């Protein structure tokens, strides 16, 4: 929905073109940051970021904004995870969704 795009960027690659890049998690990691690129969202609206449907952050996005999101707890578990970027009418999360885009990344244990 909408023209906004979210891209996950890891040392392994990006989520561009449906790719699923890996994030390697060391055994005792409590928090891991992942880089995001947000583009083509309406800049007068806030963009809400969710990881696995859990609210993580919100940003005012210009034409292209690079930021990070913190992975913690279940987000660090091995497997695929989804980042969702959403904009709502009147910046109200209970309101109508006007932009919605997702990207997937995979967490793997670091050797």
Show the residue positions of the predicted features.
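Local beta-strand/beta-hairpin segments that build beta-sheet-rich folds
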Residues: 55-58, 72, 98
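Surface-exposed, short loops/turns at beta-strand junctions within beta-sandwich domains
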Residues: 72-80
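Primarily secretory-pathway and cell-envelope proteins
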Residues: 1-46, 93-111
């Amino acid at each position: 929905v909408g023209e906004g795009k979210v891209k996950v960027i890891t040392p392994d690659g990006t989520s561009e073109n449906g790719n699923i890049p890996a994030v390697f998690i060391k055994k005792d990691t409590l928090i891991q940051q992942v880089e995001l690129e947000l583009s083509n969202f309406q800049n007068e609206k806030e963009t809400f970021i969710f990881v696995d449907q859990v609210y993580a952050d919100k940003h005012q996005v210009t034409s292209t904004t690079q930021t990070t999101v913190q992975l913690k707890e279940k987000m660090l578990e091995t497997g695929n995870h989804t980042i969702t970027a959403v904009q709502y009418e009147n910046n109200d999360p209970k309101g109508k969704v006007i932009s919605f885009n997702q990207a997937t990344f995979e967490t793997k244990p670091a050797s």
